[in-house]
């Protein structure tokens, strides 16, 4: 055995004792324990009522609608966001300008205001028609109140708002692709669309997935805003119940529990996707070692 091999085999890892961290952890655990005990023993929380309504059919139906709203709005938002992000790619200043104005407007106005606006769009356009501008021929599709229902207004508002955020996320992912990858694709004779499908978007996924997962979770919670449009989502369902029995806090806790369950499931899916697309990019862990005092012979 050489001297270098003896040195490597005699290395020992010594962890520093951090007394302050240990004391802080113990104190934090005590505070959390007292807080949980107070919540569990406080009769004003109405835990029996929570258990009675946790699996109520009206609550479960509202939760199902919340999931549907999240899935449809995110799908439409991602699809439109991809288009807007591609429009921002340098090459056509008109497309880039239109995309930039769209992102500026929808990110700069509150989502609740947008939902109420789309719900009252009939005040501006009582009849929805397709046709040429400036008095050209048109085809009347129908009344705005009939075509844009409260559920349609909610999906429209959520999707258009989400597209603005997804456009920036996808654009940042596209910008993260190394220029050398693009040059290699061009050298192989790839067209612009094929380069986007085969080179840019697959590599951008590693950057896009983490913030997209956060957006899905945010969308799930943001669907609670549609309750102002009298749509029977999860929040509106519990509101309808506590407006009859006046058990406000217990019913709000029911909605919180289901939101936590759904967001936890989405977080698990997000972490799995990050592991899948992050293979080969995980940084190596560096362990600091302390040399042994044993002399080398």
Regions found by a protein language model. Name each.
Residues 1-297:
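Transmembrane alpha-helices and adjacent helix-loop boundaries
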């Amino acid at each position: 055995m050489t001297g270098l091999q003896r040195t490597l085999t005699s290395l020992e890892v010594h962890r520093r004792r951090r007394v302050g961290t240990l004391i802080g952890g113990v104190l934090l655990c005590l505070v959390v324990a007292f807080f949980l005990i107070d919540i569990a023993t406080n009769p004003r929380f109405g835990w029996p009522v929570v258990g009675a309504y946790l699996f109520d059919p009206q609550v479960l139906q509202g939760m199902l609608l919340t999931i549907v709203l999240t899935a449809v709005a995110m799908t439409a938002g991602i699809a439109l966001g991809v288009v807007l992000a591609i429009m921002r790619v340098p090459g056509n200043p008109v497309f880039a300008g239109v995309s930039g104005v769209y992102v500026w407007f929808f990110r700069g106005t509150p989502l609740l205001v947008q939902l109420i606006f789309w719900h009252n769009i009939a005040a501006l356009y009582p009849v929805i028609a397709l046709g040429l501008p400036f008095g050209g021929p048109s085809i009347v599709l129908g009344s705005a109140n009939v075509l844009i229902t409260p559920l349609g207004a909610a999906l429209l508002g959520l999707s258009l708002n989400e597209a603005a955020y997804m456009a920036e996320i996808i654009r940042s992912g596209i910008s993260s692709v190394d220029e050398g990858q693009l040059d290699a694709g061009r050298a192989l004779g790839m067209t612009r669309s094929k380069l986007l499908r085969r080179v840019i978007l697959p590599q951008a996924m590693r950057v896009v997935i983490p913030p997209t997962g956060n957006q899905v979770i945010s969308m799930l919670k943001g669907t609670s805003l549609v309750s102002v449009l009298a749509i029977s989502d999860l929040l509106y369902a519990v509101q309808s119940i506590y407006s009859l029995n006046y058990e406000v806090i217990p019913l709000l806790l029911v909605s919180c529990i289901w939101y936590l369950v759904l967001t936890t499931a989405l977080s698990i899916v997000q972490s799995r996707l990050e592991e899948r697309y992050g293979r080969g990019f995980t940084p190596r862990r560096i362990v600091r070692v302390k040399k042994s005092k044993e002399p080398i012979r």
